């Protein structure tokens, strides 16, 4: 998809009222510093529209990006950051769960996992929550450029096994440097749009 227009339309904090959007939403979840903002920027063909940071826990809001006036990317706060207080973690958790349970337009929850490491306990909990609530789990294995090409299959298997994911669960590797995997992610997104977009990506 050619992303010609992007607007950061809504930013929701822990006390905010969630928007009632009328177009498809695609949420991105993952632990802090897994490369969520870099992925979103890569998919939107923007260098720094979604704020990236070397400091885990930077994203503390739910950010709604409106693309081409036809769909939304929803950037969820990263989980598992040790330096965030327990009280704030609880508030984030409630905020995220409220969105995921109440959105009427949410089509897919993309769960980002660092391909270099086995899924954490928080990753496993999030995956189980996605499945339990009836969503089709789609895993994006980030930081693909950090491992050798010969190690890819081994690490993808490690992610699948660590999550206890079935053979049919999609695991889409992605590199924020080369953008390898970007087209596969867009094809997945387009399957859930009412009119699949066949423009060149």
Swiss-Prot record:
Family: Belongs to the TRAFAC class TrmE-Era-EngA-EngB-Septin-like GTPase superfamily. EngB GTPase family.
Binding site for Mg(2+): 37, 59
Role noted for this protein: Necessary for normal cell division and for the maintenance of normal septation.
Every EngB-type G domain range: 22-195
The gene coding this protein: engB
Family matches, as Pfam families: MMR_HSR1
GO BP of this protein: division septum assembly
Keywords, sorted A to Z: Cell cycle, Cell division, GTP-binding, Magnesium, Metal-binding, Nucleotide-binding, Septation
GO molecular function: GTP binding; metal ion binding
Positions contributing to GTP binding: 30-37, 57-61, 75-78, 142-145, 174-176
Entry-linked HAMAP family: GTPase_EngB (MF_00321)
Cofactor (UniProt): Mg(2+)
Name of the featured protein: Probable GTP-binding protein EngB
Gene Ontology CC: one annotated term: cytosol
Record has Cytoplasm as a keyword: no
PANTHER family named among the record's database cross-references: ENGB-TYPE G DOMAIN-CONTAINING PROTEIN, MSS1/TRME-RELATED GTP-BINDING PROTEIN
């Amino acid at each position: 998809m050619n992303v010609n227009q992007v607007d950061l339309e809504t930013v929701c904090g822990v006390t905010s009222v969630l928007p009632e959007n009328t177009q498809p939403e695609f949420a991105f979840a993952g632990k802090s510093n897994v490369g969520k903002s870099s992925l979103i920027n890569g998919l939107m063909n923007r260098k720094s529209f979604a704020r990236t940071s070397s400091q885990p826990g930077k994203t503390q809001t739910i950010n709604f990006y409106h693309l081409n006036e036809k769909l939304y990317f929803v950037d969820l706060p990263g989980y598992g950051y040790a330096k965030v207080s327990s009280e704030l973690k609880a508030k984030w958790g409630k905020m995220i769960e409220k969105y995921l349970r109440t959105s009427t337009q949410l089509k897919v929850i993309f769960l980002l996992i660092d391909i270099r490491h086995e899924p954490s306990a928080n990753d496993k909990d999030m995956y189980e929550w996605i499945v339990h609530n009836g969503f089709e789990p789609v895993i994006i294995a980030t930081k693909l450029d950090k491992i050798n090409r010969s190690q890819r299959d081994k690490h993808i298997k490690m992610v699948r096994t660590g999550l206890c994911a079935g053979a049919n669960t999609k695991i889409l590797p992605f590199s924020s440097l080369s953008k390898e995997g970007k087209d596969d992610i867009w094809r997945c997104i387009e399957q859930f749009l009412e009119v699949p977009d066949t423009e060149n990506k």
